[in-house]
From Swiss-Prot:
Ranges where the record places region Disordered: 196-217, 228-247, 438-461, 604-649
Gene induction: Cell cycle-regulated. Expression peaks during S/G2 phase.
Purpose: Has a partially redundant function to WHI3, a dosage-dependent modulator of cell size.
Coiled-coil residues: none
Domain RRM: 533-625
Biased composition (Polar residues): 228-238, 631-649
Alphabetical UniProt keywords: Cytoplasm, Phosphoprotein, RNA-binding
The name this protein goes by in its record: Protein WHI4
Organism: Saccharomyces cerevisiae (strain ATCC 204508 / S288c) (Baker's yeast)
Pfam families recorded: RRM_1
Post-translational modification: Phosphorylated by PKA in vitro.
Length: 649
């Protein structure tokens, strides 16, 4: 009767109940007064809106002071969250966590222990406590137990309740019974329907959307890199982040069904390459951080091998080239080797074949001219050659990315880079004044063309890729001494590939580079040939014999065979082809031939000839063609291939 009387007084006071409840519902969920144990009247008066204050002022002796009306208004206001979602209050943000909430797990095995309970929720986040108690619903059965797991967030407890409810055998096949799941508000001891949140996630009829549907979860799991985690509406809650205020209803609706990548389709492959494993529970903020800072998986930091080489002393260069592992590791870890199998990344320099010589920078960049100018010669032009098919079809490329020339720089050094996977070797050589054609003829300052040592196997031959770069040097302490020489040495070691059947040495002594640097150039312009496995022996005395030469070269490592013949000429004795004895020596590999050239250049034959000692001994140079190969095209085809034809005879 008092309730009806109070409603009559309320109608007489000309205050609409809907207006009072609507305004009060806007303030009640935003306050935390309901979370503290306090009297109902005090709690309600603290959070009541101005509409009820007006009621008190209009009728101080009426229903406002009655506890029944106060409790009625309080109950009606706090219970609006259980509406059908169509009233005015359903649009208000009233789903504020006033927990904690308890997840109850019943129908358990008889021998369950607390340790097993912790194992079940070991991967769950936001767990406050886990208890194993006797079930109060079965007071006469002491064996019935219940697992009570306390969560601080409604989104977390409903999320894990749905997961457990979807499992038919939580405890394995030995206990093939479905466990019963309940969610209870610890303060009010009222059950919470966690399945309601699942259905509302698909109908979008109520703002209580803490959980996406199961089909949406499967789609998100299949697209782990497109996962969206936003506040309480996440399918994989994140503990403290779930207690933050939810976004607005419009943004929530737009995000709830947005399963595509919000950061762009082009970043999917980057995230898959940079992050090997990404959990579904990653937040949107963390995912954006991952996409903006990609790191190549499994790739070590690359080092600048060319710069580290030029920063060394001269003695250290020899050690690094022949015996050092650092340069080998640098080349092995370089992105150039990876670019042969996959598209180049942004850090890989792009070849510009028609660019100027100073604009092309190789993969192994060199230091500036200010670094150790007195110890090492500053770089000016350098390039790296690759096995590109269109280069082979253009034999007259000028100013290409292969070798750049500059008449103002007198001396060059060509180094073939060591490959870590194939354990290749290289020898430093000094040449001068490089023209820009593919004949690679290097001329000295006095106008005599000299021998060249290009990286021919990677330019002209459709074989395996070899790496090299051209380094120019100008050492002020040795310029005068170098100008006195008629020309400079011609030698270069070519890499031995794993996929070839050529037997080659894997280690070269440290003194080989120093020996090669002291080798004078061939005096005859016809001796300027690219490196191959066959050496031409020049400046032989007229009475030289095959036995002497065989005795001299047979002790060299990698020696294969020797071809000797006498070809006398009426022009007298000279220092080149067609005069006196002719000898060609074939080795198993270019590296063996290069080593023999460095060690035996200028040597005397076993039988001394005093009249010829002042001529400097024998002069070695690379043969135009490998032994047994003839033809004008062999220079561009077979002369650069150390796995194609030098085994023939």
């Amino acid at each position: 009767m008092s309730l009806v009387h109070n409603q009559t007084n309320l109608n007489e006071s000309k205050f609409l109940i809907e207006r009072a409840f609507s305004s009060s519902s806007e303030t009640v969920p935003l306050s935390k007064e309901a979370t503290y144990p306090m009297p109902t009247a005090y709690s309600f008066s603290a959070v009541r809106s101005n509409s009820e204050t007006n009621i008190k002022r209009e009728n101080p002796q009426g229903f406002a002071k009655e506890p029944i009306m106060t409790s009625m208004l309080h109950n009606l206001t706090m219970s609006t969250g259980k509406g059908n979602g169509n009233d005015v209050n359903s649009l208000a943000p009233h789903d504020v966590d006033v927990g904690p909430y308890c997840l109850l797990l019943r129908n358990l095995p008889k021998d369950i222990t607390l340790r097993e309970c912790y194992c079940i929720f070991s991967l769950a986040t936001g767990v406050s406590s886990i208890e194993l108690k006797r079930d109060d619903r079965e007071p006469f059965n002491d064996n019935e137990k219940v697992v009570v797991v306390k969560f601080g967030s409604l989104s977390l407890v409903t999320h894990y309740a749905n997961i457990l409810n979807s499992k038919s055998e939580i405890f394995g096949p030995s206990f093939p019974f479905r466990s019963h799941i309940d969610v209870v508000n610890e303060q009010t001891q009222l059950p919470v329907s966690f399945q309601e949140h699942v259905s509302s996630g698909t109908t979008n009829s109520s703002p209580k959307n803490y959980q996406l549907s199961s089909s949406a979860q499967n789609e998100i799991q299949n697209q782990s890199f497109n996962t969206i985690s936003y506040g309480k509406t996440s399918s994989s809650p994140l503990g403290p982040s779930a207690a933050k205020p939810r976004p607005s209803l419009l943004s929530e609706r737009s995000l709830r069904f947005s399963f595509n990548d919000p950061f762009g389709l082009e970043t999917i492959s980057q995230r898959k390459e940079s992050v090997p494993f990404l959990r579904n529970s990653i937040s949107q903020h963390d995912l954006s951080n991952v996409t903006t800072t990609p790191v190549p998986a499994g790739m070590p930091p690359q080092k600048d091998a060319g710069k580290s080489l030029l920063l060394l002393e001269k003695d250290e260069i020899n050690e690094s080239i022949w015996n050092g592992d650092e340069l080998v590791n640098d080349v092995g870890n370089s992105s150039f080797g990876a670019s042969l199998q996959e598209p180049p990344m942004s850090s890989t320099p792009v070849m510009e074949w028609n660019a100027s010589s100073t604009a092309n920078i190789p993969l192994f960049q060199l230091s500036s001219q200010e670094n150790h100018q007195s110890n090492l010669l500053p770089p000016s032009h350098h390039s790296i050659s690759q096995d590109v098919p269109h280069i082979q079809s253009q034999p007259n490329l000028n100013n290409s990315g292969v070798i750049h020339s500059a008449t103002s720089l007198p001396h060059y050094h060509l180094l073939n880079q060591i490959n870590a996977s194939t354990k290749t070797q290289s020898i430093q050589q000094s040449v001068s004044n490089v023209p820009s054609n593919l004949d690679l003829n290097l001329q000295t300052e006095n106008g005599h063309p000299q021998s060249s040592a290009p990286n021919g196997s990677s330019i002209f031959n459709n074989q395996k890729v070899n790496q090299g770069f051209l380094v120019s040097e100008q050492d002020t302490s040795t310029i005068s001494r170098q100008k006195e020489c008629s020309s400079t040495a011609s030698a270069s070691a070519f890499s031995k590939n794993n996929e070839t059947n050529v037997a080659g040495s894997t280690t070269i002594s440290q003194a080989d580079l120093s020996l090669l640097a002291k080798v004078p150039p061939p005096a005859n312009p016809a001796d300027q040939n690219p490196p191959c496995n066959t050496l031409y022996v020049g400046n032989l005395p007229p009475d030289a014999t095959e036995q002497e030469l065989r005795q001299l070269f047979s002790n060299q490592q990698g020696f294969r065979r020797l071809s000797f013949r006498n070809k006398m000429n009426s022009h007298g004795h000279g220092n080149g082809h067609g005069h006196g004895p002719i000898c060609f020596v074939e080795f198993e590999d270019v590296s063996f031939a290069t080593r023999a050239l460095a060690e035996l250049y200028g040597s005397q034959l076993p039988h001394p000839r005093p009249s010829l000692n002042n001529k400097g001994g024998i002069r070695l140079s690379f043969s135009k063609n490998p032994l047994g190969v003839r033809g004008s095209n062999s220079r561009s085809k077979s002369g650069y291939s150390f796995n194609g034809s030098y085994g023939k005879s």
